[in-house]
């Protein structure tokens, strides 16, 4: 079978698979970014309940393989009354798994911001939320981009 005969026979199926893969990539990346920011900030909280919740989530999803998580989301959750379509189960499992790794990247990026930046924001009398939003978060993107894009 020649290349062109194979492509004419299986090309539409391969194209459909490529489009589905791109959809999963985009949706799980959006979920990954949201989870990473939320749980990365939760991990730095001084409240032990918030920090503990983030730690349990991160350690669970980093400690189990993605294949096991995909299996659980698609095959085991229906036993508990929560049935997800294959696409949704894949997006949620991949997003939550990568989000756990991303949360540690965000936490490390925040801790890598020089202490002088924190002190400068404190000297300007910024609230903790404004300090993060205006000073710290914009500075972490160059720090976290290489490990997050790897």
Residue ranges and their predicted role:
Residues 1-150:
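Transmembrane alpha-helices and adjacent helix-loop boundaries
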């Amino acid at each position: 079978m020649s290349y062109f005969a194979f492509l004419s026979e299986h090309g539409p199926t391969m194209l459909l698979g490529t489009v589905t893969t791109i959809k999963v990539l985009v949706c799980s990346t959006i979920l990954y970014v949201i989870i990473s920011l939320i749980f990365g900030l939760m991990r730095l909280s001084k409240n032990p309940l918030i920090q503990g919740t983030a730690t349990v989530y991160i350690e669970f999803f980093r400690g189990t393989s993605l294949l096991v998580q995909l299996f659980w989301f698609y095959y085991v959750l229906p036993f508990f009354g929560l049935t997800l379509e294959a696409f949704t189960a894949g997006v949620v499992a991949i997003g939550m798994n990568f989000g756990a790794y991303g949360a540690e990247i965000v936490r490390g990026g925040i801790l890598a911001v020089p202490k002088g930046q924190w002190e400068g924001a404190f000297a300007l009398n910024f609230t903790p939320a404004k300090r993060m939003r205006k000073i710290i978060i914009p500075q972490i993107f160059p720090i976290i981009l290489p490990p997050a894009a790897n």
